[in-house]
Amino acid sequence: MTLNRIMKWLLFAAVIAGLLVCAFFVFRFNQPKPTTNIHYADTQNKQQTLDMYMPKGKDEDKKKHPVMIYLHGGGWTGGDKNRVASKADYFTGQGYVFVSMNYRLHPDANYGQMADDTANAIKWVKDHADEYQIDSSKINVMGHSAGGHLTALVATDSTYLKRVGLSPKTINSIVILDGPLNINQFIQAIPSYKKVFGKQEENWTKASPVTYMNQKNVPPVYLVTGWENPEVYRFAEKLNHEKGSNFVFRVHSLSHSDLNKWFGSDRAPKEAQEMTKAVMAFVKKQNQ
């Protein structure tokens, strides 16, 4: 290869690199900027904070928006509210306020205290709805993995919301991204999680959202699952009072982490895009 051709290739590579850098900064610039580390409980614990992402143009339109509160996964021992991938951009682009919350983690908290944190965050959002142009009648909650479990538990076991003066009717809809609903079944499959839920089966039953799926006033649910579990369909049927399969999206090509990572991304694989569309169709219907 001649020196002239080498120089041309180097120039071409430099141009491509420059375009990629520009694209990165444009992407970052267009991301919604959150108000971060808002304390939703009467403590200074950084695990009891949330980030608030507002729809673009919200100051101009002055109208109130539905809200999606998101709980991260992490096996009840890890994870963080700043790991939202494309969700904040996606939901704010759909006209929703997006809230990503932290909750206390094991070993500093048990699952019940995590559920209390979830209820406290929901109450904070409801109490501050006017301040952030939120329609308090359209509070939706979504969780992935452990966050999905906590979302389902708070929505079905009224104990947690009652402690903060609310009821499950406060929640307009919930979305569960591959979160465990039956902790007995879950621990039998992965015994190491006894460290989180204890060794007594009665505690596992108490921590299981399926235990409460026959309760009144539970919100409608949409579930994304990576495996064929009849209990998922029963849970969907009980909460929606319709055929369960209408409210379950079964992924086949996406892993447990990928279905969360790709949610809302316009660069996602086809199945992930279909998943996002199905979830959003459900959410929009509940927020009409």
Ranges and model annotations:
Residues 224-227, 244-288:
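C-terminal catalytic histidine-bearing segment of alpha/beta-hydrolase fold enzymes
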